[in-house]
Amino acid sequence: FWTDYSPHWKPSTRTSSRSRIDQLLIPHFGELPVDMIARSDINRWRDTMTKREGSFNRTIPIMSVMMQYAEKLGYRAKCSNPCRGVSRFKRELPERYLSADEYRRLGRALANHEFANPFVIPALLLLVYTGARASEIATLRWRYVQIPRLALPDSKTGPKTIYLNPQAIEILSGLDRRADDQLVFPALHREGPINLGEHWIRIRRKAALPDVRLHDLRHSFASAAIAKGIPLATIGKLLGHA
């Protein structure tokens, strides 16, 4: 499946799909023969994902394509896709801006949490300061860093330029620049990009921000500052990044 399908996907799609297969599908279905996976198995998996609704909604299409491919190869009966008819979670995504106190709590959590991967904090701060998507930060390579901008050749909406404010420039300038094709924020114990979602679950728990998603952090912190009346420099200080 991967060999045949992934070459036709954008690099960012390959990265996110590989992560979802490895972290969500293989642990749950990896020991089941492909022809034995039933609708009931998909529904049980859905039941385990009630606190990760967005992840389920983004991953079940991958599972569905894999089942269709198994049918094509003759490993499953025709029209037996167990994902067909399984409903996705309905999600309301209201705008969520952090208050000054919440920025302060987040700053304390970042300062007091010990990360094995030294790139966690700068990656999260860059997400906050740029309003970029988590996937854009995670897959950022040094050749895309052209201060005072990020030149992304492959974002969700196509090529994209992100202009950097002083806080974002300071974050990137504090990192050791490596070869152009290297990731700015690599994973620690495996090949590939950092998994910000995995780290964020622990950080938001420590910061007592259980309802704040990475998607909320990526809202332009300039917009958040306008909505809450908090100066940009003040947000940097609250996050411990003066």
Model-derived regions, located:
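Short, aromatic/basic-rich helix-turn unit that serves as a nucleic-acid recognition element
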Residues: 1-22
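A Lys/Arg-rich helix-loop hairpin that forms a DNA/phosphate-binding surface
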Residues: 15, 26-47, 77-80, 91-95, ...
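Short basic/aromatic active-site micro-motif
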Residues: 37, 119-121, 210-229
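Basic, Lys/Arg- and aromatic-enriched nucleic-acid-binding interface segment
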Residues: 53-61, 72-134, 138, 147, ...
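Active-site-proximal segment of tyrosine recombinases
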Residues: 136-138, 212-213, 222, 229-241
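Well-ordered beta-strand positions in beta-sheet-rich domains
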Residues: 149, 161-163
